[in-house]
């Protein structure tokens, strides 16, 4: 089917829209996409309003989505709750978690200093200063994220929980060669692979729509491809993606005190 062939019957689809894809909404809710992260569909309506019948009566699709939203915690909530309880270098004590994070931040700053020296070769003084400022901003951002100082509205308890969860993400990724961290690392990797697959699907969907209708207004009144491109910026597991920006090469990660405790345990052997 060509783009012009599609135009022969496209108007008959109105006012139907991808906004009415209840199954996709259920998947997003189950995984943990927050309402505050969603892009407005326009006209002051939410994605839940788009699922209702003309006149505002609830449809079966709307009821399914509402039931999904009310049905307990999301996968993201459960995953992050587990991560906040993962022992860091053998301890869950807040002071030990902070000690690990500060040691890691020191290694990150040292690594960025090394990168700056390598990249400065052949650059003009002004360019070196620009690069220095970028690395300084990266160091500051890493500290704010890992120590959970990036949300001034968070309570002390929320900040402590986030700090523990982010430390666990970093710990698992940085020491994934340790036997007892192998399956946690595989889990986190699978989560990112899942979200990557969703992002690829969104991108391909947007490009297919653009190929057939260009930048036209959507049948449901949306901005069309512009709206679809914005949804491709969704990140459900934002902290997991952020940690990827903070990883260090194996030789640069700080040594931990209890690496032996993350090895294999064989009963009956000394």
Swiss-Prot record:
Coiled-coil region: none
InterPro entries hit by this protein: Trp/Indoleamine_2_3_dOase-like, Trp_2_3_dOase
Pfam families named among the record's database cross-references: Trp_dioxygenase
Domain of life, per lineage: Bacteria
GO biological process per UniProt: L-tryptophan catabolic process to acetyl-CoA; L-tryptophan catabolic process to kynurenine
Family under the similarity heading: Belongs to the tryptophan 2,3-dioxygenase family.
Name of the protein this chain belongs to: Tryptophan 2,3-dioxygenase-like protein
Gene Ontology molecular-function annotations: heme binding; metal ion binding; tryptophan 2,3-dioxygenase activity
């Amino acid at each position: 089917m060509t783009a012009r062939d599609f135009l022969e019957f496209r108007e008959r689809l109105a006012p139907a829209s991808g906004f009415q894809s209840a199954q996709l909404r259920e998947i997003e809710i189950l995984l943990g996409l927050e309402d505050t992260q969603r892009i407005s569909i326009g006209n002051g309506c939410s994605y839940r309003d788009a699922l209702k019948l003309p006149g505002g009566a609830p449809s079966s699709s709307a009821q399914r989505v509402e039931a999904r939203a009310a049905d307990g915690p999301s996968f993201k909530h459960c995953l992050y709750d587990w991560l906040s309880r993962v022992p860091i270098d053998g301890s869950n004590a807040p002071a030990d978690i902070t000690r690990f994070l500060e040691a890691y931040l020191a290694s990150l700053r040292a690594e960025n200093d090394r990168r700056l020296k390598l990249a400065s070769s052949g650059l003009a003084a002004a360019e070196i200063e620009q690069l220095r400022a970028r690395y300084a901003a990266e160091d500051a951002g890493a500290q704010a994220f890992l120590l959970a100082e990036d949300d001034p509205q968070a309570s002390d308890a929320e900040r402590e929980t986030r700090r523990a969860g982010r430390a666990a993400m970093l710990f698992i990724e940085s020491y994934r060669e340790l036997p007892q961290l192998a399956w946690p690392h595989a889990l986190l990797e699978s989560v990112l692979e899942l979200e990557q697959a969703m992002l690829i699907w969104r991108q391909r969907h947007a490009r297919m729509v653009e190929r057939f209708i260009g930048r036209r207004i959507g049948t449901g009144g949306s901005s069309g491809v512009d709206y679809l491109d914005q949804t491709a910026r969704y990140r459900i597991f934002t902290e997991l993606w952020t940690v990827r920006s903070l990883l260090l090469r194996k030789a640069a990660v700080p040594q931990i005190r209890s690496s032996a405790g993350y090895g294999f345990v064989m009963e009956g052997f000394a």
